[in-house]
């Protein structure tokens, strides 16, 4: 997968996953804001929708192509495994930071694979897939940033994702913003403060 890697000085690795139309550079500044010392691994989605990179196909707005989602989730997991060898970082210290479509593929990693991530910061995610048995996520720290008036990820959707994670044992937290789907500076600050407490 097309990506950029910036070496840090700590053991943590931030896996940066952009929203629709973004690229591997989009969340570098956010990653450095959250953890100035972490290694940064920015990844570009390999699916194109009207020329815009995404991490998996969708059938329509808010309706995911679940078969493609499963395939792309496995591809991303395999890529992380390979990148850990290529760049010589600690595979057990990977924390996802995703926005929108990137948050959805990060959530899908959690839904499909046990111990695939050390933690996750999900900005405006949806429930990636329903009707599957989720792995044990005992104690896994997960931050969900949600907008009370988000037209793409409704309040009900955010709460449903939180319940799935919580019921699978994750230590999940939802941080609500008064706005919509945009990622605000205040939300980024909340994510950073959460990270300082939750990721050790």
From Swiss-Prot:
Pfam families: DLH. Its EC number is 3.1.-.-. Induction: Repressed by MhqR. Strongly induced by stress due to exposure to 2-methylhydroquinone (2-MHQ) and less strongly induced after diamide or catechol stress. Not induced by oxidative stress due to hydrogen peroxide or methylglyoxal. It is found in: Cytoplasm. It is an enzyme of class 3 (hydrolase). Coiled coil: none annotated. GO terms for biological process: catabolic process; response to toxic substance. GO terms for molecular function: hydrolase activity. Keywords: Aromatic hydrocarbons catabolism, Cytoplasm, Detoxification, Hydrolase. GO terms for cellular component: cytoplasm. The keyword Cytoplasm applies. The active site is at residues 100, 150, 181. Putative hydrolase that may contribute to the degradation of aromatic compounds. Belongs to the AB hydrolase superfamily. AB hydrolase 2 family. This is Putative hydrolase MhqD. It comes from Bacillus subtilis (strain 168). The lineage of its organism: Bacteria, Bacillati, Bacillota, Bacilli, Bacillales. The gene is mhqD.
């Amino acid at each position: 997968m097309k990506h950029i890697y910036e070496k840090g000085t700590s053991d943590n690795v931030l896996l940066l996953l952009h929203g629709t139309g973004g690229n591997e550079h989009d969340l570098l500044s956010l990653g450095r804001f959250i953890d100035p010392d972490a290694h940064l691994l920015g990844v570009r989605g390999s699916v194109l929708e009207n020329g815009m990179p995404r991490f998996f196909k969708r059938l329509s707005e808010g309706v995911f192509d679940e078969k493609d989602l499963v395939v792309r989730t496995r591809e991303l997991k395999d890529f992380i495994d390979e990148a850990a060898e290529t760049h010589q970082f600690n595979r057990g210290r990977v924390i996802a930071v995703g926005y929108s479509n990137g948050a959805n593929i990060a959530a899908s990693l959690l839904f499909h694979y046990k111990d695939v991530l050390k933690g996750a910061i999900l900005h405006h995610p949806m429930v990636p897939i329903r009707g599957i048995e989720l792995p044990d996520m005992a104690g896994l720290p997960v931050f969900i940033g949600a907008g009370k008036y988000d037209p793409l990820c409704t309040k009900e959707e955010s709460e449903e994702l939180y319940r799935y994670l919580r019921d699978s044992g994750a230590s999940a937290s939802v941080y609500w913003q008064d706005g919509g789907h945009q990622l605000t500076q205040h939300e980024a600050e909340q994510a950073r403060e959460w990270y300082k407490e939750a990721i050790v």
